[in-house]
Regions:
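Glycine-rich phosphate/diphosphate-binding loops that line cofactor/substrate pockets in enzymes
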Residues: 1-2, 223
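Aromatic- and Gly/Pro-rich donor/ligand-binding loops
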Residues: 4-15, 19-171
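A nucleotide-sugar donor-handling region in carbohydrate enzymes
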Residues: 103-120, 129, 153-155, 159-225
Length: 225
């Protein structure tokens, strides 16, 4: 049987994204399904797509407002040396945790990934908030560039989709062979936009038991205090 390729947010330095990406890979391991996660650390197409979206939001006040916390944190890090040091320690630990992933070689374009698809039986996207408008515009988590595709517990991250993005959402949702999501509202969004049904499933982090999570838990806190 061919491998399954996983498309996840394994590179984000936050607990939710990394743990969900890890759990998705671990669950496939438990099912004896050979798998690996697509490496887009150096992907030009992905970066261009995100830049394009952010440029389009320059005059969108609600969007700018939602990023104020991120901007404030960057400024705080410049003036608060202790905060910056603690965050650097945390980020280093995130990088170390990434070593638990089986990553492919880095792919610089979507075309490069598509050319490798014959190696995989399916490409699985999930979970996390991968179907936010910014990600749909960047066209990576849509899986538009591969033939055999499924989603597991993927989230839209928002309760409604702006009408101007409906065509983009309809295009990629209608081409996914099997769709599962982690929120009831997301099931409704899939049906409303594409006319397709979506299965409601639990987040992959809930599929691992306590013992399995304790196996990767640090004995001591990363940062004191």
């Amino acid at each position: 049987m061919k491998k399954v390729a996983i498309v996840s947010c394994y590179f984000k330095k936050n607990y939710g994204s990394l743990l969900q990406a890890y759990a998705t890979q671990k669950i496939l391991d438990k099912l004896n399904i050979e798998n690996e996660t697509i490496n887009i650390d150096e992907n030009i197409d992905f970066k261009k797509g995100k830049k394009k979206f952010y440029k389009s939001q320059i005059l969108n006040f609600p969007f700018i407002k939602s990023k104020i916390g991120m901007i404030k944190l960057k400024l705080d890090r410049k003036v608060n040396k202790k905060l910056n040091k603690n965050l650097e320690i945390r980020e280093k630990k995130f990088e170390e945790f990434r070593n638990k992933f089986r990553l492919t070689k880095p792919f610089t374009t979507y075309e490069e990934i598509a050319q490798q698809c014959e190696k995989y039986s399916d490409v699985l996207v999930g979970s996390d908030q991968l179907w936010l408008p910014v990600n749909v515009v960047s066209d990576y988590y849509t899986l538009n560039w591969v033939p055999n595709k499924v989603s597991y517990a993927t989230s839209f991250g928002i309760s409604s989709i702006p009408k101007k993005y409906y065509d983009k959402y309809r295009k990629f949702l209608s081409r996914i062979d099997f769709i599962s999501v982690r929120e009831k509202n997301a099931c409704e969004l899939v049906t409303d936009i594409s006319g397709k049904d979506a299965e409601l499933v639990c987040d992959p982090t809930l599929l691992l038991n306590k013992k399995e999570w304790l196996e990767i838990q640090e004995e001591k806190p990363i940062v004191k205090g």
